[in-house]
Design a protein with these regions (language model features):
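Cationic, low-complexity basic patches in intrinsically disordered or flexible, solvent-exposed regions
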Residues: 4, 13, 26
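Short amphipathic alpha-helix that is part of the acyltransferase structural core
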Residues: 23-100, 104-106
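Conserved acyl-donor/pantetheine-binding loop and adjacent beta-alpha core of acyl/acetyltransferases
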Residues: 96-135, 153, 166-176
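Active-site acidic-Proline motif in GNAT/NAT acetyltransferases
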Residues: 139-141
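Conserved acetyl-CoA-binding loop-helix of GNAT-fold acetyltransferases
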Residues: 144-159
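Post-Walker A helix-loop "phosphate-sensing" segment adjacent to the P-loop in P-loop NTPases
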Residues: 162
Length: 176
C-alpha cells in the first residue's frame, strides 16, 4: 500500500512523500483490536491536546519530559516535514519528531542536549546531511502492533526525498 503525505509550505505546492507500507506486516494482536483505520500523517498544532494525553501515558513514571506546546510549534515552524503522528481510528497513538543536523556538528560523540540545542532546536540546519530523530513513541495500549514501523518507513522515505546521508536517533532517559 502506497500512502502520500503532503506538507504545505508558504504558498508553494509543498513537499510530498510517498511511503510504501506494503512490507509492514500485522500480527494477531492487531487483528483482535478491531481497528478500522490507521493513518500516518503530518502533525498539526491542533493535535497538541491529544498528543499531550499520549505523552502523559507514555511517560507515566512521573517524569516531566513532555514536549511543550511551544516546542511543538517551533518544530512545526522550522521543519514541518519532520513531525508526524500515527492515528488509529481518529486517536493519536504515536508520534515521531525530527530535525536535520550536519554530521560534522554532532559526529558520534554528542549528548541529546547538544544535538537539540537544549530542546530549543536551534541546531536544526535545513542544509544539514543527517535526519536526526529526537522522539518516537507509541501509546502503551497500542504497542506490539508494529505501528512505529510506519513512522520509521516515513523517515526513511523523507531522508531519501531530501537527499540526506543517513538517519540518527537520540532519546531522553527520564530520571537519568
Amino acid at each position: 500500500m502506497k500512502e502520500r503525505l503532503t506538507f504545505p509550505s508558504d504558498g508553494e505546492q509543498g513537499l510530498e512523500i510517498s511511503c510504501n507500507f506494503a512490507g509492514v506486516k500485522y500480527d494477531e494482536q492487531m487483528e483482535n483490536q478491531s481497528i478500522t483505520k490507521i493513518q500516518v500523517r503530518p502533525l498539526q498544532i491542533e493535535d497538541y491536546g491529544q498528543l499531550a494525553q499520549s505523552f502523559r501515558r507514555v511517560y507515566s513514571d512521573g517524569s516531566d519530559v513532555f514536549w511543550t506546546h511551544e516546542q511543538i510549534e517551533t518544530l512545526l515552524r522550522i521543519f514541518p516535514e519532520g513531525q508526524i503522528v500515527t492515528v488509529v481510528d481518529e486517536k493519536i497513538v504515536g508520534c515521531a519528531l525530527s530535525i536535520i543536523v550536519n554530521y560534522d556538528d554532532v559526529k558520534n560523540d554528542h549528548t541529546y542536549a547538544q544535538v537539540t540545542g537544549k530542546e530549543t532546536f536551534n541546531t536544526h540546519n535545513p542544509k544539514g546531511n543527517i535526519l536526526y530523530g529526537i522522539e518516537v513513541f507509541i501509546h502503551p495500549d497500542y504497542r506490539g502492533l508494529r505501528l512505529a514501523r510506519r513512522m520509521y518507513e516515513y523517515r526513511k522515505d523523507l531522508c531519501e526525498k531530501l537527499n540526506l546521508k543517513s538517519i540518527m536517533f537520540g532519546g531522553r532517559i527520564p530520571h537519568y
